[in-house]
Structures are given as structure tokens and as C-alpha cells.
């Protein structure tokens, strides 16, 4: 299991989908790194995380 991924926004922590399932989170974009597809989400508090697609 990856704990971080490298994105255009820098190295982001990987979190489960349940972590971003509130109204405070906004989907930003999809990307891949080392063959792993993930989505990037941003929170109203400034936190940015990646959610790996399963």
C-alpha cells in the first residue's frame, strides 16, 4: 500500500475514500504515478490528499 504519491502539487499523502466523503472536500483532478491511478481532493482547510483508485 502506498502512503504517498508524487503529483504536480508535490508529494501528497494517500487517504481512503471515506476520508474525503464530506462536503468540505472537492475533487480536483485524476493522475497516475508509477502505474497507480489516483484522484486528488482538496479540503476547505487547505489540506490536499490523494485517493487511490481500486
Predicted regions and their residues:
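A short beta-strand micro-motif
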Residues: 3-8
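Acidic, low-complexity, intrinsically disordered interaction modules
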Residues: 12-54
Amino acid at each position: 500500500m502506498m502512503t504517498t504519491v508524487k503529483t504536480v502539487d508535490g508529494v501528497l499523502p494517500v487517504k481512503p475514500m471515506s476520508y474525503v466523503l464530506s462536503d468540505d472536500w472537492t475533487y480536483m483532478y485524476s493522475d497516475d504515478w508509477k502505474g497507480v491511478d489516483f484522484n486528488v481532493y482538496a479540503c476547505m482547510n487547505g489540506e490536499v490528499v490523494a485517493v487511490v483508485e481500486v
